[in-house]
Every structure is written in C-alpha cells, then in structure tokens.
Amino acid sequence: MTGASQLALMERSPSADYASEAELLAACRRRETGAFEQLFRAHGARLKSIAYHTVGNRQDAEDAVQDTFLKAYRGIDGFTGASAIGTWLCRICINACYDLVRKRQLEAERVQPPDQPPAPQLALRAALDQALKRIDPRRRMVFLLFAVEGMKHSEIASILEIPEGTSKAWLFEAKRELQHLLTEKRP
C-alpha cells in the first residue's frame, strides 16, 4: 500500500476518542485509523507550527507534517514509550523538516533566482528569517521550540535528545548570535 493510499484510508475512517495515551497507542498499534485521526487532532497544529518555523513556508510545512504522520503510521510498533507520543512525533517532524531543508538547499544550489528587495513592511521579518538561517540548526531549533512554541527546556531536551542544560546553553547562544546578526552593520 502506498503512502498516499494509507493516508487516504486514514482520512475516510470514522473517528473515535481514546481516553488515555495508553489506549490511543494500543489503538494505533492495531492500525485503527480513528486513533491516528485523534493523534492528528491532538498534535497536528503544534507540528505544523514547528515545521513552518523550520522550513519557512506553509506548503513545505504541510508536506513535512504529512510525512511525519506517515512515518508514525509505519513506525508505531517501534515506539517504545520512553517519552510521550507527542514528543516522539515532534522528533519525527523535526527530522522530516531537516530532510526537506537539505533537499531544498540542494535544489536551490542548482537554480539561483535573482534577488528581489523585500517590501518595507517585511524587512524586519526578512532580516530575522535570514539571521535564523545563519545560526547553527541545533540552536535555531531550541530557539524556535522555546520562543515560538513556548516549550520548556525539559520538553525540548526530550524532543532533541539532549541534556536540559544543553538546551539552556543553546538557547542562550542562539539569542546572542541573533542579537549580533541583527545589529551588525551591512556594507
């Protein structure tokens, strides 16, 4: 069964509500599509936000989230339960985003469009986006999860599989780098 047909099957099934994460996980392992719908309802918006801030546009973010749920569907039996299912989905989503960003960078290296000056009202956002692209991807992810998603360092550490202290240090470094990049003089 192809990924598209698996997702189409999931979209057509009736939805059910599962009271606990354990029940939901058991239903997902039985491939009950209503369980995957509940996973999407519970975590889809957060994953879309993370993906959007990682890849930079809605279409790619939607592709990354779709890929996330497809990988979760295929790999649910490998989920050990060492973390919350939402944490596991975030990890899959971040990896899907990184894969997509790498793919887009390779495509962009082949074709370079002409630069167009940003509209005045978009200048600050464009400067921030450019600065975010220039910092280390790991620090950028910590910054986005903390500043945009409002996650705690303990959640970030679990998702990124790093110590909590590393999350705090990377956030500090990301803020310092962004401040430097946004205030540096351009020739």
Where do the language-model regions lie?
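Short, charged helix-capping/linker segments at alpha-helix termini
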Residues: 11-15, 29-38, 48-67, 164, ...
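Short, aromatic/basic-enriched loop-to-helix "N-cap" motif that marks the start
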Residues: 75-91, 164, 169
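A short pre-motif secondary-structure segment
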Residues: 142-146
